[in-house]
A protein has these predicted regions:
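Alpha-helical scaffold segments that mediate packing/assembly in large oligomeric complexes
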Residues: 1-37, 152-157
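Sequence/fold signature of self-assembling virion shell proteins
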Residues: 59-157
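Flexible, active-site-adjacent loop/turn segments at secondary-structure boundaries
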Residues: 1-4, 17, 55, 61, ...
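Long, contiguous amphipathic alpha-helices that act as assembly "spine/axial" helices in icosahedral shell
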Residues: 1-13, 36-51, 117, 121-142
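Hydrophobic, aromatic-enriched interface-forming segments
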Residues: 19-62
Length: 157
């Protein structure tokens, strides 16, 4: 859900392109340059890719990714570092259709927990023990004055 909100609210949405092993590096560098031109800080950037895009990146001779990532970062989903951005691989089923890649700064979007409520029922009828019921409501927002910190590249179908 959060990636969908970020894709819709992105400040940079160039025309869809067919990503190949020959052009993937140039497209990512274009994204980085666009964020640089809008004075987005170079620290705390994240490059979100699908497994298919990650495969193209691995096949590209121009990309040399720093893959010596600590265990703590791997637990968070970071698989590499490219041009100073943490590279995060996300399953295509969790991303919008035709998702190529997204380069974003952490200050451009927030994903708050709006509601978190739990109830415990001690020994309810039919159950021996404690029954816990709960609900959690999440949301996501792209800040209007920070939307230039998101570059979303769609791929051609």
């Amino acid at each position: 859900y959060v990636y969908g909100v970020m894709a819709v609210g992105a400040g940079h949405k160039p025309a869809a392109v067919a990503l190949t092993k020959d052009n993937i590096y140039d497209e990512i560098i274009k994204a980085s340059a666009a964020l640089d031109d809008d004075l987005v800080p170079e620290t705390d950037r994240a490059l979100t890719v699908t497994p298919a895009t990650y495969l193209l990146m691995k096949k590209c001779k121009d990309i040399v990714m720093e893959t010596e990532i600590g265990e703590e970062m791997r637990i968070r989903g970071v698989i590499a570092n490219l041009d100073g951005a943490m590279t995060i691989k996300v399953a295509a089923s969790r991303l919008p259709e035709n998702f190529g890649f997204m380069l974003s700064h952490k200050s451009a979007c927030c994903a708050p927990t709006q509601l978190e409520d739990y109830n415990e029922h001690k020994n309810p009828p039919g159950i021996n023990g404690t029954l816990v019921e709960g609900r959690i409501v999440y949301d996501a927002y792209v800040f209007e004055n920070k939307k230039k910190g998101i570059y979303y590249q769609e791929i051609t179908a």
